[in-house]
Design a protein with these regions (language model features):
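N-terminal, positively charged, Ser/Thr/Ala/Gly-biased leader segments
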Residues: 1-86
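Phosphate/pyrophosphate- and phosphate-bearing ligand-binding catalytic cores of soluble enzymes
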Residues: 2, 6, 40-41, 47-50, ...
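Hydrophobic side chains in well-ordered alpha-helices
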Residues: 26, 71-72, 131, 197, ...
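N-terminal glycine-rich flavin-associated loop
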Residues: 45-83, 95-140, 167-186
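Core subunits and conserved enzymes of cellular information-processing
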Residues: 136, 147, 156-159, 164-165, ...
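An amphipathic, basic-hydrophobic helix/alpha-beta surface used to engage anionic
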Residues: 151
Length: 225
Protein backbone atom coordinates (compact mmCIF):
# COMPACT_ATOMS: atom_id res chain seq x y z
CA UNK A 1 0.00 0.00 0.00
CA UNK A 2 1.13 3.51 -0.71
CA UNK A 3 1.95 6.01 2.00
CA UNK A 4 1.61 9.77 1.97
CA UNK A 5 4.45 11.17 -0.07
CA UNK A 6 4.55 14.89 -0.75
CA UNK A 7 7.12 14.36 -3.50
CA UNK A 8 4.67 12.29 -5.52
CA UNK A 9 1.40 14.00 -4.67
CA UNK A 10 1.18 17.68 -3.87
CA UNK A 11 -1.50 18.05 -1.23
CA UNK A 12 -2.90 21.28 -2.64
CA UNK A 13 -3.22 19.95 -6.17
CA UNK A 14 -5.90 17.28 -5.77
CA UNK A 15 -8.82 18.37 -7.94
CA UNK A 16 -12.36 17.08 -7.83
CA UNK A 17 -14.82 18.00 -10.55
CA UNK A 18 -12.81 21.12 -11.42
CA UNK A 19 -12.91 22.33 -7.78
CA UNK A 20 -10.19 22.38 -5.16
CA UNK A 21 -11.94 20.46 -2.40
CA UNK A 22 -8.70 19.52 -0.72
CA UNK A 23 -5.97 21.71 0.63
CA UNK A 24 -3.17 21.10 3.06
CA UNK A 25 -5.26 22.11 6.06
CA UNK A 26 -8.02 19.61 5.23
CA UNK A 27 -5.59 16.77 4.64
CA UNK A 28 -3.77 17.57 7.86
CA UNK A 29 -7.12 17.60 9.66
CA UNK A 30 -7.94 14.13 8.34
CA UNK A 31 -4.49 12.87 9.29
CA UNK A 32 -4.92 14.40 12.73
CA UNK A 33 -8.13 12.54 13.51
CA UNK A 34 -7.50 9.26 11.67
CA UNK A 35 -3.72 9.02 12.03
CA UNK A 36 -1.17 10.05 9.41
CA UNK A 37 -0.41 6.45 8.46
CA UNK A 38 -4.12 5.88 7.87
CA UNK A 39 -4.56 8.60 5.25
CA UNK A 40 -3.38 7.77 1.73
CA UNK A 41 -3.55 9.95 -1.36
CA UNK A 42 -4.37 8.70 -4.87
CA UNK A 43 -4.70 5.19 -3.47
CA UNK A 44 -5.53 2.55 -6.14
CA UNK A 45 -8.89 1.01 -5.29
CA UNK A 46 -7.78 -2.22 -6.98
CA UNK A 47 -5.79 -2.84 -3.79
CA UNK A 48 -9.01 -2.81 -1.79
CA UNK A 49 -11.54 -4.75 -3.88
CA UNK A 50 -11.92 -8.48 -4.36
CA UNK A 51 -12.15 -7.96 -8.13
CA UNK A 52 -8.70 -6.29 -8.06
CA UNK A 53 -9.80 -3.51 -10.38
CA UNK A 54 -10.46 0.19 -9.91
CA UNK A 55 -8.73 3.52 -10.28
CA UNK A 56 -7.52 5.75 -7.45
CA UNK A 57 -9.45 7.22 -4.57
CA UNK A 58 -8.45 10.86 -4.12
CA UNK A 59 -8.05 10.27 -0.40
CA UNK A 60 -8.32 6.84 1.25
CA UNK A 61 -8.80 6.76 5.02
CA UNK A 62 -8.71 3.69 7.29
CA UNK A 63 -9.63 4.76 10.83
CA UNK A 64 -8.52 2.14 13.34
CA UNK A 65 -10.72 3.27 16.23
CA UNK A 66 -14.39 4.17 16.50
CA UNK A 67 -13.38 7.58 17.83
CA UNK A 68 -11.17 8.13 14.79
CA UNK A 69 -14.00 7.05 12.51
CA UNK A 70 -16.48 9.48 14.06
CA UNK A 71 -13.96 12.32 13.86
CA UNK A 72 -13.20 11.48 10.22
CA UNK A 73 -16.87 11.50 9.28
CA UNK A 74 -17.38 14.75 11.18
CA UNK A 75 -14.55 16.37 9.22
CA UNK A 76 -16.01 15.21 5.91
CA UNK A 77 -19.51 16.42 6.77
CA UNK A 78 -18.39 19.80 8.12
CA UNK A 79 -16.18 20.45 5.09
CA UNK A 80 -18.79 19.13 2.64
CA UNK A 81 -16.34 16.61 1.18
CA UNK A 82 -17.59 13.89 -1.19
CA UNK A 83 -17.69 10.73 0.93
CA UNK A 84 -17.83 7.01 0.13
CA UNK A 85 -17.87 4.37 2.87
CA UNK A 86 -16.66 0.86 2.05
CA UNK A 87 -15.98 -2.36 3.90
CA UNK A 88 -13.84 -5.26 2.73
CA UNK A 89 -14.40 -4.44 -0.94
CA UNK A 90 -16.22 -7.69 -1.68
CA UNK A 91 -18.13 -7.44 -4.98
CA UNK A 92 -17.31 -3.74 -5.17
CA UNK A 93 -16.89 -2.47 -8.72
CA UNK A 94 -14.82 0.68 -9.17
CA UNK A 95 -14.22 2.26 -12.57
CA UNK A 96 -10.82 3.14 -13.99
CA UNK A 97 -11.36 6.79 -13.07
CA UNK A 98 -11.56 5.85 -9.42
CA UNK A 99 -13.60 7.56 -6.71
CA UNK A 100 -13.69 11.29 -6.15
CA UNK A 101 -13.42 12.64 -2.65
CA UNK A 102 -12.77 10.70 0.54
CA UNK A 103 -13.13 6.93 0.76
CA UNK A 104 -13.44 5.65 4.32
CA UNK A 105 -12.70 1.94 4.74
CA UNK A 106 -13.94 0.19 7.87
CA UNK A 107 -12.01 -3.05 7.62
CA UNK A 108 -8.65 -2.13 9.14
CA UNK A 109 -9.18 -1.89 12.89
CA UNK A 110 -12.92 -1.93 13.43
CA UNK A 111 -13.25 -5.70 13.67
CA UNK A 112 -13.98 -6.63 17.30
CA UNK A 113 -16.21 -9.65 17.92
CA UNK A 114 -18.01 -10.31 21.22
CA UNK A 115 -19.98 -13.43 22.15
CA UNK A 116 -22.64 -13.19 24.87
CA UNK A 117 -24.72 -16.31 25.21
CA UNK A 118 -26.34 -16.90 21.84
CA UNK A 119 -25.77 -13.30 20.77
CA UNK A 120 -22.72 -12.30 18.74
CA UNK A 121 -21.90 -8.63 18.22
CA UNK A 122 -19.35 -7.79 15.56
CA UNK A 123 -17.90 -4.49 14.41
CA UNK A 124 -18.61 -3.45 10.83
CA UNK A 125 -15.10 -4.30 9.66
CA UNK A 126 -15.12 -7.87 10.98
CA UNK A 127 -15.10 -10.54 8.29
CA UNK A 128 -18.09 -12.86 8.10
CA UNK A 129 -15.73 -15.83 8.19
CA UNK A 130 -14.21 -14.59 11.45
CA UNK A 131 -17.64 -14.07 13.01
CA UNK A 132 -18.67 -17.59 12.02
CA UNK A 133 -15.44 -18.99 13.46
CA UNK A 134 -15.90 -17.13 16.76
CA UNK A 135 -19.48 -18.37 16.95
CA UNK A 136 -18.45 -21.95 16.21
CA UNK A 137 -15.78 -21.84 18.91
CA UNK A 138 -18.54 -20.82 21.33
CA UNK A 139 -20.68 -23.75 20.19
CA UNK A 140 -23.06 -21.62 18.14
CA UNK A 141 -24.41 -22.31 14.68
CA UNK A 142 -26.46 -20.38 12.16
CA UNK A 143 -23.81 -18.41 10.29
CA UNK A 144 -22.83 -21.28 8.02
CA UNK A 145 -24.68 -20.20 4.85
CA UNK A 146 -22.97 -16.82 4.73
CA UNK A 147 -19.64 -17.67 6.36
CA UNK A 148 -17.96 -18.27 3.00
CA UNK A 149 -18.80 -14.84 1.63
CA UNK A 150 -15.54 -12.82 1.47
CA UNK A 151 -17.13 -9.73 2.94
CA UNK A 152 -17.46 -7.75 6.14
CA UNK A 153 -20.32 -7.48 8.60
CA UNK A 154 -21.05 -3.92 7.51
CA UNK A 155 -21.24 -4.89 3.87
CA UNK A 156 -23.39 -7.92 4.68
CA UNK A 157 -25.91 -5.70 6.48
CA UNK A 158 -25.80 -3.07 3.75
CA UNK A 159 -26.77 -5.48 0.99
CA UNK A 160 -28.33 -8.32 3.01
CA UNK A 161 -25.65 -10.71 1.79
CA UNK A 162 -26.67 -14.28 1.20
CA UNK A 163 -25.58 -17.66 -0.12
CA UNK A 164 -26.66 -21.31 -0.03
CA UNK A 165 -30.23 -20.45 0.89
CA UNK A 166 -29.38 -18.18 3.80
CA UNK A 167 -29.24 -14.40 4.19
CA UNK A 168 -27.91 -11.95 6.75
CA UNK A 169 -31.45 -11.04 7.77
CA UNK A 170 -32.05 -14.65 8.87
CA UNK A 171 -29.77 -14.20 11.90
CA UNK A 172 -29.64 -10.42 12.31
CA UNK A 173 -31.12 -8.91 15.46
CA UNK A 174 -30.05 -5.26 15.21
CA UNK A 175 -27.59 -2.82 13.65
CA UNK A 176 -25.84 0.09 15.35
CA UNK A 177 -24.92 2.96 13.06
CA UNK A 178 -24.23 6.68 12.75
CA UNK A 179 -26.70 8.69 10.68
CA UNK A 180 -25.75 11.72 8.59
CA UNK A 181 -25.92 13.95 11.69
CA UNK A 182 -23.53 11.58 13.51
CA UNK A 183 -26.30 10.54 15.88
CA UNK A 184 -25.76 7.03 17.23
CA UNK A 185 -28.77 4.89 16.38
CA UNK A 186 -29.82 1.28 16.78
CA UNK A 187 -32.47 -0.31 14.58
CA UNK A 188 -33.89 -3.83 14.89
CA UNK A 189 -33.67 -6.02 11.83
CA UNK A 190 -37.40 -5.74 11.20
CA UNK A 191 -37.00 -2.00 10.58
CA UNK A 192 -34.13 -2.30 8.10
CA UNK A 193 -36.23 -3.04 4.99
CA UNK A 194 -34.03 -6.01 4.17
CA UNK A 195 -34.88 -7.70 0.90
CA UNK A 196 -32.99 -9.52 -1.81
CA UNK A 197 -29.52 -7.89 -1.72
CA UNK A 198 -30.87 -4.64 -0.36
CA UNK A 199 -31.60 -2.79 2.88
CA UNK A 200 -32.49 0.65 4.19
CA UNK A 201 -28.78 1.52 4.15
CA UNK A 202 -28.75 1.59 0.35
CA UNK A 203 -31.27 4.42 0.57
CA UNK A 204 -29.07 6.28 3.05
CA UNK A 205 -25.46 6.00 1.82
CA UNK A 206 -24.31 8.58 4.39
CA UNK A 207 -25.28 6.29 7.26
CA UNK A 208 -22.25 4.46 8.61
CA UNK A 209 -22.73 1.00 10.08
CA UNK A 210 -20.69 0.49 13.25
CA UNK A 211 -21.70 -2.99 14.37
CA UNK A 212 -24.34 -5.68 14.14
CA UNK A 213 -25.73 -8.23 16.56
CA UNK A 214 -26.84 -11.65 15.37
CA UNK A 215 -28.77 -14.29 17.29
CA UNK A 216 -27.62 -17.87 16.78
CA UNK A 217 -28.45 -21.19 18.37
CA UNK A 218 -26.59 -23.82 20.30
CA UNK A 219 -25.15 -26.60 18.22
CA UNK A 220 -22.04 -28.56 17.41
CA UNK A 221 -19.61 -25.78 16.60
CA UNK A 222 -16.87 -28.30 15.84
CA UNK A 223 -18.79 -29.44 12.77
CA UNK A 224 -18.78 -25.88 11.48
CA UNK A 225 -15.05 -25.41 12.06
Amino acid sequence: MQSIDDNDHQKADIRLHENDFFNEDLLCALAGVAGEDNVLMSEPMREHTTFKIGGPADVFVTPDTEQGLVATLDTCYRCDLPLTIVGNGSDLLVGDKGIRGVVVALSKGLSDITVDGTHVTAAAGALLSDVAAAAAEAGLTGMEPISGIPGSVGGACYMNAGAYGGEMKDVLESVTFLDDTLELRVLPAKDLAMGYRTSVFEQHPDWCILSATVVLHRGNGAEVL
